[in-house]
Design a protein with these regions (language model features):
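Well-ordered mid-protein domain cores that form the structural environment of catalytic cofactors
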Residues: 78, 89-138
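Terminal, non-catalytic domain-edge segments
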Residues: 1-27, 223-227, 231, 235-243, ...
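Low-complexity, Ser/Thr/Pro/Gly-enriched N-terminal "stalk/linker" regions
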Residues: 1-45, 55, 59, 63-74, ...
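Buried hydrophobic core positions in alpha-solenoid tandem helical repeats
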Residues: 17, 53, 69, 76, ...
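Eukaryote-skewed repeat-based solenoidal scaffolds used as protein-protein interaction platforms
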Residues: 118-198, 204-205, 210, 214, ...
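Solvent-exposed loop and edge beta-strand segments that line ligand/cofactor-binding
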Residues: 19-47, 83-100, 136-151, 187-216, ...
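Well-ordered alpha-helical scaffold segments within catalytic/enzyme domains
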Residues: 1-2, 47-63, 101-120, 152-167, ...
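Alpha-helical junction/boundary sensor with strong preference for TPR arrays
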Residues: 21, 60, 80, 113, ...
């Protein structure tokens, strides 16, 4: 079921991103970046498209994507790269925590598709990512900020530890993963996407954001658990995925109406996160019902795609709201990962937990 939809959707998004890539201005802080028609700017994380671009360059033999990926890398070096190894989130702000997302996709790009690059380019990229990995290893702020960062960095450090054969990364990965274990409630909900991360508010509440949990934190925790084979963490990941699946609507939308970061809520998830598909498909070997959630959400992404871009909801275009490119380049990474790992064949339809709930 659904065979081919991941590749078709990935090609559609990436073709539009190619169209929006800036060329020929002579300004290194512009050329290579991807212009957002909704925000009238170049988003600092647009070079997250490097991994899906290289995937398509490799799969389809399309030289355009290889050149676009290299241009994106150079754009990032001139614009958001910093001397300490970090990447800032945007030129208008100093936050460096999003370096973790850049490192994850760049390591995956080098691991699977680095052979497409010229030897000197490959070495330069590898050295640059190593510098970013060193920054992440020593960035202690992840221990006190929103929970998604300690979890995603545990995955980043794991990937870098394996790629660079560096035990210091592996040790840091394990430390952060152990910290993450403390952030799950008895019911399986992930807590800590807000302040206080490890405590209670004055009204004795805990910060929870369904969108970020399903599309960013749980996917990274699931990958960590399955990549390491840690049985305890695999069980925790499956319990959490099951608990959060109750917030998926029958049409594949996600209910994040009460989330601590619901200002980023979209009908299918959250604006700047990567998506829930890979996690649910990866864990579907343990619980086949998870593949149903992946299929429904994928269909919702397909339904919300118009003119080559992923819109935030099913009626946004007809209301005159333009689509932010962040939606497309972030979720393109997940589609590439699904195809990379051959998980598309697991997609299936069925009944979601929401449909089984009895109403009074």
């Amino acid at each position: 079921m659904g065979y081919g939809i991941c590749l078709d959707l990935l090609r559609e998004w990436c073709e539009k991103l190619l169209e929006l890539q800036i060329h020929g201005t002579g300004q290194p802080t512009l050329d290579g970046g991807i212009l957002c028609p909704a925000c009238a700017r170049v988003h600092g994380r647009c070079f997250d498209a490097i991994y899906p671009f290289l995937y398509l360059a490799d799969r389809d033999g399309d030289q355009r994507y290889l050149e676009a990926a290299k241009q994106l890398f150079e754009w990032a070096e001139h614009t958001v790269s910093r001397e300490d190894g970090s990447y800032i989130n945007d030129t208008s702000g100093p936050w460096k925590g999003t370096t973790v997302f850049s490192v994850i996709q760049l390591v995956e790009a080098l691991k699977y598709h680095g052979h497409l690059l010229e030897p000197d380019v490959y070495c330069r990229w590898k050295d640059r990512v190593k510098k970013a990995a060193d920054f992440l290893r020593d960035f202690e702020e992840f221990e006190v900020c929103n929970v998604n960062y300690r979890i995603t960095n545990s995955l980043a450090m794991l990937l870098c530890g394996e790629f660079y054969a560096d035990d210091s990364y592996m040790q840091r990965s394990q430390e952060l993963a152990e910290m993450a274990e403390q952030c799950f409630s008895e019911s399986g909900l992930l807590i800590g996407e807000g302040r206080p991360v490890d405590g209670y508010s004055k009204k004795h509440c805990r910060p929870v954001d369904i969108g970020y949990n399903m599309e960013e934190s749980l996917p990274s925790f699931t990958q960590y658990a399955f990549y390491t084979g840690d049985k305890k963490k695999k069980a925790m990941a499956c319990k959490a995925l099951r608990a959060h699946l109750s917030f998926m609507l029958e049409d594949g939308g996600i209910d994040n109406s009460f989330g601590t970061r619901n200002y980023k809520w979209t009908y299918w998830g959250s604006r700047t996160s990567d998506g829930c598909l890979f996690a649910y498909l990866m864990a579907s070997q343990e619980e086949p019902e998870f593949a149903v959630g992946a299929w429904r959400n994928l269909k919702r992404l397909r339904a919300c795609t118009e003119e080559g871009l992923l819109y935030s909801g099913p009626h946004m275009r007809e209301k005159g709201e333009l689509s932010c490119v962040h939606h497309s380049f972030s979720h393109a990474k997940v589609l590439a990962m699904i195809l990379e790992h051959g998980l598309e064949s697991r997609l299936c339809d069925g009944i979601l937990p929401r449909a089984k709930m009895k109403t009074p």
